[in-house]
Amino acid sequence: MALKSPAFRRKFPLLVTGGLLALQPLATSYAVAAEQFDCQVSAAGGWDCKPKAPVNNLPPRPVHEGAAVSSGTEAASEGETADRPMLVTEAKGRALKSRSEDYSHLDWVPREKLTAAQLAETGPYCGGAYVEPTRPGMADTTPKDESPTYINAKVSKYQQEQQIATLAGDVVMRQGSMQAEADEANLYQTENRGELKGNVKIRDNGSLVVGDEAQIQLDTGEAQVDNAEYVMHKSHIRGSALYAKRGENAIIRLKDGTYTTCEPGSNAWQLKGNNITLNPATGFGTATNVTLRVKDFPVFYTPYIYFPIDDRRQSGFLPPSFSTSSDTGFMLVTPYYFNLAPNYDATLYPRYMAKRGLLMEGEFRYLTPSSEGQFGGAYLNDKDDDRKEQTDYKDQRWMVNWQHKGGLDERLMTEVDYTDISDPFYFQDLESDQIGVESRDLLNQQGALTYRGDNYTARLNVHAYEMATISQITPYDRLPQITLNGVLPYNPGGLVMGYESEAVRFDRDLKDDFVRDKDGNPDFSAGAAGRRLDQNVSGIARANGNRFNVAPSISLPMEASYGYLTPKLKYAYTHYDLDLDSQGKAQAIAQSANPAYGSYNSSLNRDVPIFSVDSGLYFDRNTSLFGTNYKQTLEPRLFYLNVPYKDQRDIPIFDSSETLFSYDSLFRDNRFSGTDRIGDENKLSLGVTTRWIEDNGFERQNFSIGQAYYFKDRKVQLPGIYYKDRQSAQSDTSPYALVYNYYFNRDWRFNSDFNWDPDSRSTRSGSAMFHYQPEDNPNKVVNLGYRYRNDTIIYDSTTGTWKEGGSYGNPGDPNYIKDYYKIQQHDFSVIWPIVPQWSVIARWQHDYNRNRTLEAMGGFEYDNCCWKLRLINRYWIDYDDFSQALPANEKGDHGVFLQIVLKGLGGVVGNKVESFLDQGIQGYREREDQAY
């Protein structure tokens, strides 16, 4: 039944029905025993009820066993003899089994009874889930003061004079989305309140409060439940309190309450506080005088805490984290989040370090319809004096950064990536919690504006670098760089006419001041005492300059279902305006006698025609392999390239390097990256690829092999390298390039490449990688890989020259290491469940070239429905710039890392574990993203 409140009086509309009359349409009678009443609104605004004479004799009212309404005396007598109900404080963090053995009173459903959809939202190690039962009105959004009220009970009694209704037996009251249930209820009409007794349940949109007794305000929905337990279904949250108060705004306040995401039978962890407030409207809770209890044992205290109860954002303290290390001592981070608006927010990261002091760090994030980004900054007055004698160190440590991506319209895009730091040792000594800040040797200080037309792209770029190391030479800045690339909008006769153009200024300031190491002694890394690495840069390599490049091209793509043929002609013209200091000019004159170097000219021009023909065929056939049907393809490819020799020794290297040899490099028109070198080549590259494709489109495996045939030597080289001293530049053939990939299924894959040199009958480079991670169980991760490379061209900062091979420095130098840059490594990592809830975590990366372990770690993970623990023993090579010599800065380090994650609160200790697992184990991030 439903009854609207009279418009002139905001009172709870009372309507009681018995048995089969429950939840029927509007009526005006009360059912009490064998009598009926007519009830009308009185002049005073209350109810005026009079007995109604029945038309026919009513049949006897059915008696519900155990549901009779008792008098006050009878109730008191019964209470004296009944067993005292168990208090929630006696359960020590667990749910009360006295209310239901299977915790069904909290809507707990065992895992085996969950539907497939419910299982998908339940953690793999959870024994069940809180499932809100379907009920009438649960999605009702009508305001309380406008909602009709429905009441159902097996037996009812109404006292006309006192206007008190007494209900018994499966009492249900519903108004809007809120529903109250109890064994018995007394409803006081004049006070608009009710008293509920026995198995009390109060439900509202995704929440449930259970107790022994309750007081409820009938017109507002306010309620107080004694000896209460509560559940928030979607957030997997439960708890208890001496009493719980539900406000008119659905906010739940708990006295001496608890909060946890653990299963009903577990007390693995809980927050226990004097006063806990849960606000479903904001998605956050607060608590005062809080102890974090593990197995009901207090392990942490805070006078105040602010925590999420769902995935929404709200201002307040985020879960703190603490750790300890030799660099910082004890460290405590207490982040505070500012939810300023739906589209922008801020986070403050106060970081206390016992050895260094208080680092204040913060970030501001923004999101607009056309852009997104963040500002950040940090400051520390560093108390640690380990580096106080070292050059470039500053005790006033700071960092500022700005990342931005946006579009002024659908064609015009803007980008900013800017980071600046106080000294080059900032990221070696300090950590950052900011999103988007990367710790690397060269920090970007870049801004770009890009316009995308229908057939072209124009870009204005300003790109400088901030050094976060002293063991590298200062790089060139692009101040500015303008590019315009595209194709003409018409294609006469099928011709494609394209163009590439660039105008850029390269500039850098080479340092020449005196350098001291960590102990205050002159640094000998660069040769002479106190010498900067920048002073090893000599000759025209010291030049700054402007570069203008334009490269129009014309091609004729001819395509058919069985293959393609694309002849192409490109003309590259480059102009340089250079400026060089007196030191560089003098050195350039001396170096010009060496055939590997050029001479200095302030103005240079270079023009190079590039002709290529790319062609390929496509064949396929139906075949069978091990009982599986496949479509096998055969895709031969032929590529001819002719680039005449142009002497480029007078041109400095601003942004070029030699690309590594691979199967794909057989079909490139330049073996150098950048613009400062265009390789001379007259070659014919042959390659063939075959694939096995199943009927459903899944590519099971593919294999490619290729080789290039050279018709002349490759004379164009990087400065300091003479082609006659390099065997690979005079060979008639390239190494054989092989690529093989096999996909066991969508979970397993094997990827490999192999480059074998027939002249030296040795492997130039190669790699093999096995990766396993089931799509339906990403908790299993296995990686096994091997890498080998002995054909690198490196820039040696100790000599300021390019050279072939992997040695650091020259023989006789104190820091010389043979084959330092040669790669010969294996990498094995695994995360594997050994028994339910327990997984082993391990990684071993070994360098065979120098016979050393680069990183080794082993440990275990315990994953529970409500918490996770990782304990990992780790050894790694740490890089810390105490001098300019790279090898001298490599030191082995060791640590034991403990990470504890309380689900629903976040990481309490060991957040650093996330970073090295993410960087070191392929598939770890995918595993965590799909974890509960």
Swiss-Prot record:
Q: Where mainly found?
A: membrane
Q: Is Membrane tagged as a keyword? A: yes
Could you tell me the keywords of this UniProt record?
Cell outer membrane, Membrane, Signal
Pfam families from the entry? Answer: LptD, LptD_N
Q: Where is this region: Disordered?
A: 54-87
Q: Please state the span of the N-terminal signal peptide per the UniProt entry.
A: 1-33
Q: Where in the cell is it found?
A: Cell outer membrane
**GO CC terms:** cell outer membrane; transporter complex
**BP-aspect Gene Ontology terms:** Gram-negative-bacterium-type cell outer membrane assembly; lipopolysaccharide transport
Keyword Translocase in the entry? The reply is: no
Q: How does it assemble?
A: Component of the lipopolysaccharide transport and assembly complex. Interacts with LptE and LptA.
Instruction: State the protein's purpose.
Output: Together with LptE, is involved in the assembly of lipopolysaccharide (LPS) at the surface of the outer membrane.
**Family, per entry:** Belongs to the LptD family.
- Name of the molecule in the record: LPS-assembly protein LptD
Naturally occurring in which organism (per UniProt): Pseudomonas putida (strain GB-1)
